[in-house]
Amino acid sequence: MALTCTDIPKFICAVLLPPIGVFLEKGCDYHLAICILLTILGYIPGIIYACYVILAY
């Protein structure tokens, strides 16, 4: 999917605090719960998953 202007702030949020970027993209969904869990288990997996969600949707 093509990147839009709104994806840039989402990526910035995804790097600083990954669940925020996912919340801005998908809202309160199971993706948010997965991202929170991955961020707690390891910061880098949370960032990777957040970037995946932003790029995929």
UniProtKB/Swiss-Prot annotation:
InterPro entries: PMP3. Coiled coil: none annotated. Keywords: Membrane, Transmembrane, Transmembrane helix. It is a multi-pass membrane protein. The chain crosses the membrane at residues 4-24, 36-56. It is found in: Membrane. Its main location: membrane. GO terms for cellular component: membrane. Pfam families: Pmp3. It comes from the Eukaryota. The keyword 4Fe-4S does not apply. Belongs to the UPF0057 (PMP3) family. This is UPF0057 membrane protein T23F2.3.
